[in-house]
Amino acid sequence: MLTISKLIPQGQGLAPVLLRRASTMELDWDVRQKSRFEATDSAGRQLGVFLPRGTVVRGGDVLVAEDGSLVKVDAAPQPVLRITPCSSHGTAFDLTRAAYHLGNRHVPIELKPDHLKIEPDHVLADMLRAMHLTVLAVNEPFEPENGAYATGGHAHDHDGEPEHVHGPGCQHAH
């Protein structure tokens, strides 16, 4: 079994040719939120992944094996509930309200401009339908938010402005 103990977020800094040559593996959210797991890559190799505790693997991340080989992670399609405003009388605010109620329940949630995604839960689905939202069971990749206290952001200030923090993936320049 090949051991992996390093993660490069979104393959940052790697040449595109290296990413094209890397093996891949599809992992669902249940596995990607664990820091230790076993998996098989597209080359058929058995992998033992041992990342620092609390590490979450995202689709697009690249894992580095002990032999130097790279493995690109894809978020596997999995059963999720896709939540959208009612097409006849819903508004974008309905999604904001739904996100608030789901957040109060500490539900892992993927936020998109036009929809939300959560793991299947018939009680939550009924609650959302009662809020006049459309809830559809689909099979799609799931990338929930890290949460307000997750690590990985960066802090900086702007000439005379108070310091503030941007989350992972923020690409704007100042």
From Swiss-Prot:
Residues 146-174 are annotated as: Disordered. One of its GO terms (molecular function) is unfolded protein binding. The keyword Cytoplasm applies. The keyword Coiled coil does not apply. SUPFAM superfamilies: Urease metallochaperone UreE, C-terminal domain, Urease metallochaperone UreE, N-terminal domain. Pfam families: UreE_C, UreE_N. Keywords: Chaperone, Cytoplasm, Nickel, Nickel insertion. InterPro entries: UreE, UreE_C_dom, UreE_N, UreE_N_sf. Belongs to the UreE family. This is Urease accessory protein UreE.
